[in-house]
Curated annotation (Swiss-Prot):
GO biological process, one term: DNA replication, removal of RNA primer
Protein's recorded name: Ribonuclease HII
Domain (RNase H type-2) ranges: 76-264
Cofactor names: Mn(2+); Mg(2+)
Length: 289
């Protein structure tokens, strides 16, 4: 959960504190005043913070609250799912589904975007060792045929269906529910709120990053290992210089422009839907390692 810290004038804070105190209301005794004084003297726990153009915002880590509530009702297993790679110009969308073990939840789980690469790698290994998970890929060809949203939802659904144990409830990040054989709950900003979705976001991100490093060896010159296929200036320059590779998404505007420059006679290639579900383990994901 993200909250903007309100900038309240010092006098307003003092007035509010005075109204709230037992002494100000005239009904407090010395013990209450002493307890209030100790509570005021004790520093409050500091939430995680990040900087933005509007100042400092408090960021609470994801919790296991939703999963635990279902577990108490006898609804288990519960899976969280998320994807990585909607925005890039090259490479697949990678979707992951994770069922956490309530008794072996790795510490430090968070939205993959709020973690460093080193933190993601460390948590990825812990998730693989303690959780049930599956990964599915939507190829650039499928993205071209179905569009990025439909391809992403397809991959998320396939990842859930590939889990070693069928879940009874699924949490998915975003606004859209997916086609699964159980109740599906879409949670906007779920990778920062629901712990199992956060775990899935890490698995998807690390898997895709490793895959793009492997594709960089197959197609040198584009810098996939650096930008992971996103449309940064270095990637756009390489695309303009070399033209599209087989790993680029043919219908994304910068790729279309590069193809017109290098292959003005060529049609958009016919989609070759090679992307199938792949259930992976920690060692199998170590692509290019």
């Amino acid at each position: 959960m993200i909250r903007d810290q309100a900038k309240t004038p010092g006098r307003a804070k003092s007035a509010a504190a005075a109204k709230a105190s037992p002494a100000a209301k005239g009904g407090g005794n010395e013990a209450a005043q002493s307890a209030a004084g100790k509570a005021a003297a004790k520093p409050a726990a500091k939430p995680a913070t990040s900087k933005s153009g509007k100042g400092v915002i408090a960021v609470a880590p994801p919790s296991f609250r939703r999963e635990r509530a279902l577990l108490k009702q006898g609804i288990w297993p519960v899976a969280g799912c998320d994807e990585a790679g909607r925005g890039p110009l090259a490479g697949p969308v990678v979707a992951a589904a994770v069922i956490l073990d309530p008794n072996r939840i790795p510490k430090g789980l968070d939205d993959s975007k709020r973690l460093s690469a080193e933190q993601r790698e460390a948590l990825f290994d812990k998730i693989c060792k303690t959780s049930a998970f599956a990964v599915a890929f939507a190829s650039p060809a499928r993205i071209d045929r179905d569009n990025i949203l439909r391809a992403s939802l397809w991959a998320l659904s396939r990842a859930v269906r590939a889990l070693p144990e069928a879940p009874k409830h699924v949490f998915v990040d975003g606004r859209d529910r997916i086609d699964v054989d159980c109740h599906c709950e879409a949670v906007i900003g779920g990778d920062g709120l629901v712990m199992s979705i956060a775990a899935a976001s890490i698995v998807a991100k690390v898997t895709r990053d490793r895959l793009m490093c492997a594709l960089a060896q197959d197609c040198p010159g584009y810098g996939f290992e650096q930008h992971k296929g996103y449309g940064v200036p270095e990637h756009l320059a390489a695309l303009d210089r070399l033209g599209p590779s087989v790993h680029h998404r043919s219908l994304f505007a910068p790729v279309v422009a590069a193809r017109r420059k290098h292959q003005p006679w060529a049609d958009v290639p016919e989609p070759d839907l090679f992307a199938d579900v792949t259930v992976v383990t920690s060692s199998e994901i170590a692509l290019g390692a």
